[in-house]
Amino acid sequence: MGIKYLLRDKMVVRSWRHIKERYCLIGVRCKNCGTVYFPSREICPKCRRKTEFEEIKLSGKGKVYTYSVVHVAPKDFEKQAPYVIAIIELEEGARITGQIVDCKPEDVYIGMQVEAVFRRIKEDGDDGVITYGYKFKPIEN
């Protein structure tokens, strides 16, 4: 049983369980077919079965696969609008959703080379906890 069992049974706060994905871009590679996924999972959709995975540190570099400009933002993000949310295809093959920063929405395009950066996501209330995580910025050529 022990601590590992408690962690698997989600007895700890959710934010602690997702530290590797949120702050380090740690993904997994299926040992059977080699497909890379982010965030981690227990079943490989390609193999269609439960299999073994190995953790891998993702480079954070990739290209914009598709994107959308958000003009009417949800609560806590109103001040950022308009902003771009994109699906990024990482060099390792995994696709990840993230905000594009450090450029105007009209400058974003499909195929644009980007890299992950660690940024402020939001703040809970006036005196609340600041949440940080990854976003993506264009790679200057």
UniProtKB/Swiss-Prot annotation:
GO terms for molecular function: metal ion binding. Belongs to the scaffold protein DUF35 family. Zn(2+) binds at residues 30, 33, 44, 47. Keywords: Metal-binding, Zinc. Interacts with acetoacetyl-CoA thiolase and HMG-CoA synthase (HMGCS) that catalyzes the first and second step in the mevalonate pathway, respectively. The lineage of its organism: Archaea, Methanobacteriati, Methanobacteriota, Methanomada group, Methanococci. It comes from the Archaea. Functions as a scaffold to connect the acetoacetyl-CoA thiolase and HMG-CoA synthase (HMGCS) dimers in the channeling thiolase/HMGCS complex, which allows for efficient coupling of the endergonic thiolase reaction with the exergonic HMGCS reaction. This is DUF35 domain-containing scaffold protein. The keyword Metal-binding applies.
